[in-house]
Every structure is written in C-alpha cells, then in structure tokens.
C-alpha cells in the first residue's frame, strides 16, 4: 500500500497509488542471458497456492488470486539456517491484498513452508480489516521475529498499523497488537508504509515507524478543496518482545503540504544509535519534490534530531520503454543499510540524474561519520540505456556491500508484446566507492504478466539479507510465463 498526497491546483486530492509469441521472445532473451551470465544456483520458489483463494472479502476491485508481491526477508541471528519471508498474497488492483503470508525455512532456504499472518479478515484469527499491505519482518538477537502490517478497509477509510511476533521461527504468530487505528466514522487519517526493525543486540526491543496522512477535518467533501494536508512520521517501540508497544508518537513533524514516506530504521549495534531514513516530500511539486532524508536518536527513540537531507530524490518514474505503459515501482522509497562493524551508513534509491532525467537508475550515498556528511550520489547499476528500479542494500560483517535491482536490458527494440525484466546484484568491497561482480539473480521474466495496480506491479520493495557467514540472500518476485491463474511467485536466491 502506498498513499501519497498529490497536489492538483487549485484543489488537493488524496490518491491511492497502488500503481506463442510471448514464449518465443522470452525464450530468446533467456538464451542470450545464459550465454552472458556466469552459472549460479537457481532461485528457490518460496510462495505457494494462496491460503486465501476462497476469501470473498475486500472488493470492489480486481483481485489477482495466487499473485504474490512485495516480499521482505530476515535471517534469524540465533539460528541462521532459519529465515522468514513475508509478502502480500492475492494483490488487489486498487491497493493491498487479501492478506499477508509468512514463509519460513530451517535449512538455509532449500525448502520453505508457509502460514497466513493474522492481519486481515481473510486470515484465521486475523484483524477484521478487509485488506493488508506492506509486509515487513525483523529478527531480534534471541530469535524473536517481529512483523507489521498496514491493515485497512476498501469499503470505508478504517485503517491501522498492527504488529505480531513469532517465537518459533515463523511457524506461528501471536494475536496482533494494534499500534494505531483510525477507524470510521473519521476520514481524516490514513496510516501507511510501515516498517519494523529489531534491535540487533537488545533482546525484546523493536521499533516500528510509519507515516500518517492527515486531512484537516472529517468531511471528505471539504477536504477536496483544502491544501492543508500533511504526513508526519510516527514511532512505537516494544521492550518486552512484542507483548506491549509504546503509544504512537510523532518523530518527524511536518507543516501543511509536506509528508514523509518509506520510513525505515537501522541500528548501530555498537553505539545503539537509531537512524530513521525516509523520503521527505516538500513543495514545489516537481521531480525534485522528494528528498532522501534521515533523523537519528541516541537515546533509544526517546528524542530525535531534526531531518537532514542527503540528496534530492530525482525519480523519473518507470515505464515500458517501447510502449510507455506504466510500471509501478518503489520510485519514492529509499532503502538504507548499516555496516555492523564500522557503523558506515548506506542508502540507495531510484534516480534519473545519471541520464538527464529520462528514466530511473540506482543511486547510492554513504556516510562514515554518523550522517554528518554524505558522499555525492553514485550510480550503482550497469548503464544499459534502460530503467533500473527497486534497489535493496545490505552490508556484511566484513564490510562488503550488496545492491540488488531490476532492469529492462533484455528488452529488444520494437518488442511491444512482452517486457523482459532481469534481477541483478552488484557488490562493493571498498566502502561503496565502486561496484563490480555483477551477476544475474533472476529473469528474464515478462513484467506484463504482473498484477496491474496502476501499472505492472511486483512491489515497492524486494527483500535482501545477509548471514553471519557473509552469505547474501536476495528475495524477489518474478512472473510465471503464460499462467494467468498464478501470475507471480516469490523466489529466494541461495
């Protein structure tokens, strides 16, 4: 789920952004890729048949049963062969999904089992909201897994942020705790784009952050003619393993016509400093309206610094280069990481600055002084003359930095029937100064088979985590060729 206030002079409106020939073309692209790319282990399918296939809750809209999008991954530091993946299950065309599902493995990703999470009415024991979105999971040092959701109704404006925990590696999940709820009859508030981060050294402690879009009153007709919306960042934490959570509080306050989105915390395990990264959206509303920004806390979230801007987020958006059809991506969502040994910070995002603003590529900036200064944005992806999108970043204990992303390099000129898409990784061994060792992780697959949510959609983000052994593991979505009853699956790279 992603809600963003979009300004349309002279009024403001709230837009729910959810944004044989085929076989032969994809086969040809795959054959070319096999020649150009070194051999590596095939990705493992993580997802399976939808547990919500019989659920009829949540309309109106087009529901893509068996379509999985937007995965996230966390490795259990107490047992690294145990990992949890979470994703949206049965994506809707106009926002969210039937529910969220957790996949879990106890053999390092060779095999996976699955269970519904209790965040929506389609799930056993779930909250009574019609849909769920924005899956997230994070393991603490004692093996407790924390997961969060945006849960909401399509039939009205009721919505909430909820959290659930697992003490058995993802097999079962606790009844959800509601961190904040803004239910009907109010139409003033919508909570969105949450994430959760477990403290890597303090067992039982985890932090949730999200943005809340706020209109000035509960009259939706009056709100059509106001410019007084805003979207501050909220924060809640648990110190008892998810049994209780602190009252939600604002940690980034913004004036009218400004908002944050994509909040995500990383923790320095040596100093305990918390860093919350986000997109700070400010007028004038043009390609530079978004800014990659962060705040920090040295007292476990009690107080926070003022926002510091790292760089303009100059996204151009993503479309099919040959047809102009929209592809919905995480174009306004920065992704951060921290070196657990040195505390060096990294953040990646989509940006058009490297090609004159014509299409998105992958930018990275890094800080070695706790965010006091940042490097100029560096292009990470291999230039192909085509868009690259949905970056993820992680750092291992030796300081190696992996960035993953999709791109359209496999698309041939004149091909308007398919959109071959590849998933790639690159690594830096010099603190983010250079990136090399490019390798294909997945694809090519046809993006045009993905659910359409105001654009072909496989998620605003994809998963990536690293084992204590410095083994990186991407988690990502691909489409399934020619199977419209099972458009997408989640894959794990061993």
Residue map of PLM features:
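Gram-negative bacterial Sec-dependent N-terminal signal peptides
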Residues: 2-14, 18-39
